[in-house]
């Protein structure tokens, strides 16, 4: 069976459902796929059971259950991620297994914002999810319009507390379950034929309009983490790796950043699969020939980048998830002063954890396996670091935590 070719006709956007347990995230995900399936060619409906029994996948050595679905609206192609368990969300967002360009926050109109609603909003803020659209679910269970308005106000206020624009965020009421039931009974329902199905359309209209199309990786500034270094007699030194973002072409001036003082060099050759290229773009695995660089000047863990786009740092604040014993993590707590390895892009760097904070800003004196915590890290060597960058924490070769850089200190 020939593989179906991925047709790139519409812009692609990654989104996900977030919110408190049992507020209807998975039901909504199923409803969206069913509604979009009968209205756009490139979508297939998914049943609740298929999404709920999400397969396990690994990201940075951590097992996460995640369901990936895809669908199209008239203007866009969406990849949508839904996690069955709360712990899966925490791990997913921190490891960046599912990088979201925006999220649909599902809040039950009957209950209002609950503790996990707030935790997911906070997480979204900390890991850099740029936009949120709200779906007020279970509208059919709320008899009093005013109650629903109060819940909407409370959600907007909660979003504002976490520095999202609470006044501007679109809030769409509806019932995911009734929309799903209507679609299951009659899978060919069109817009305008059922009030609950129409609310799913209204939600996707809001997502289409409010969540901006992300800048493609190829349009960003060039960056490649060095994986290996070779010396070619008579030609010079070649650094290999995968282009993380942007593009690079022959003759470009680039910088070598991290571990040693930053140096400038010129790209004198590009190779991929033994073929020479004029230009290389995000996603390519390439070898880059560098002018005037000796093999000992460059090593795994450094990055090649467009000049003055990334700088080396040693101290940063991060949001970290610490693995449980069952996940292969530590069996015992650790304390300030703990010195594990930090695996960033392609290399391990030893670092010291200076201090921990809980979400409420209070000082934490120790961290238990399974905790999510803010920590200040100081590395023994400077490496190229930027806000939003992911890393793993390792000890003796095994992953004990995963984190994302929230602020650079030094």
Swiss-Prot record:
Keywords: Chloroplast, Elongation factor, GTP-binding, Hydrolase, Magnesium, Metal-binding, Nucleotide-binding, Plastid, Protein biosynthesis. One of its GO terms (biological process) is mitochondrial translational elongation. Residues 175-177 are annotated as: G5. SUPFAM superfamilies: EF-Tu/eEF-1alpha/eIF2-gamma C-terminal domain, P-loop containing nucleoside triphosphate hydrolases, Translation proteins. Residues 61-65 are annotated as: G2. Residues 10-215 form the tr-type G domain. It is an enzyme of class 3 (hydrolase). It is found in: Plastid, Chloroplast. The keyword Chloroplast applies. It catalyses: GTP + H2O = GDP + phosphate + H(+). GTP binds at residues 19-26, 82-86, 137-140. Residues 137-140 are annotated as: G4. The keyword Magnesium applies. Its EC number is 3.6.5.3. Residues 82-85 are annotated as: G3. Disulfide bonds: none annotated. GO terms for molecular function: GTP binding; GTPase activity; translation elongation factor activity. InterPro entries: EF-Tu_GTP-bd, EF-Tu_GTPase, EFTu-like_2, EFTU_2, G_TR_CS, P-loop_NTPase, Small_GTP-bd, T_Tr_GTP-bd_dom. Pfam families: GTP_EFTU, GTP_EFTU_D2, GTP_EFTU_D3. PROSITE patterns: G_TR_1, G_TR_2. GTP hydrolase that promotes the GTP-dependent binding of aminoacyl-tRNA to the A-site of ribosomes during protein biosynthesis. Belongs to the TRAFAC class translation factor GTPase superfamily. Classic translation factor GTPase family. EF-Tu/EF-1A subfamily. This is Elongation factor Tu, chloroplastic. It comes from Nephroselmis olivacea. The lineage of its organism: Eukaryota, Viridiplantae, Chlorophyta, Nephroselmidophyceae, Nephroselmidales. The gene is tufA.
């Amino acid at each position: 069976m020939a593989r179906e070719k991925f047709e790139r006709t519409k812009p692609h956007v990654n989104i996900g459902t977030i919110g408190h347990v049992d507020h209807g995230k998975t039901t909504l995900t199923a409803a969206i796929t069913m509604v979009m399936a009968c209205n756009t060619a490139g979508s297939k409906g998914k049943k609740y059971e298929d999404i709920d029994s999400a397969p396990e996948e690994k990201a940075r050595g951590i097992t996460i259950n995640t369901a990936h679905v895809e669908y199209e609206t008239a203007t866009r192609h969406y990849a949508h991620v839904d996690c069955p368990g709360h712990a899966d969300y925490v791990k997913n967002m921190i490891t960046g297994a599912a990088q979201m360009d925006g999220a649909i926050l599902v809040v039950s109109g009957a209950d209002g914002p609950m503790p996990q609603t707030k935790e997911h909003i906070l997480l979204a803020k900390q890991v850099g999810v740029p936009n949120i659209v709200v779906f007020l679910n279970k509208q059919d269970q709320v008899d009093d319009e005013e109650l629903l308005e109060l819940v909407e106000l409370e959600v907007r206020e909660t979003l504002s507390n976490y520095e999202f624009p609470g006044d501007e965020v679109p809030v769409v009421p509806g019932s995911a379950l009734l929309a799903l039931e209507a679609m299951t009974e009659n899978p060919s329902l069109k817009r305008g034929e059922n009030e609950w199905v129409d609310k799913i359309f209204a939600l996707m209209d809001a997502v289409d309009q409010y969540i901006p199309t992300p800048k493609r990786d190829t349009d960003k500034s060039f960056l490649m983490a060095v994986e290996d270094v070779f010396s070619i007699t008579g030609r010079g030194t070649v650094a290999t790796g995968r282009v993380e973002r942007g593009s690079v072409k022959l003759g470009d001036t680039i910088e070598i950043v991290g571990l040693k003082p930053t140096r400038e060099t010129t790209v004198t050759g590009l190779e991929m699969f033994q073929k020479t290229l004029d230009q290389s773009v995000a996603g390519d695995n390439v070898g880059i020939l560098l002018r005037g660089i000796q093999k000992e000047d460059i090593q795994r863990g450094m990055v090649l980048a467009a000049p003055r786009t990334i700088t080396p740092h040693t101290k940063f604040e991060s949001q970290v998830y610490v693995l449980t014993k069952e996940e292969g993590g530590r069996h015992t707590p650790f304390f300030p002063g703990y010195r594990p390895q930090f695996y960033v892009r392609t290399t391990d760097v030893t670092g010291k954890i200076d201090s921990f904070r809980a979400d409420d800003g209070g000082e934490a004196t120790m961290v238990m396996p399974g905790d999510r915590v803010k920590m200040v890290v100081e590395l023994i060597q400077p490496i190229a670091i930027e806000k939003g960058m992911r890393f793993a924490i390792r000890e003796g070769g095994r992953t004990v935590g995963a984190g994302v850089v929230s602020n650079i200190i030094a």
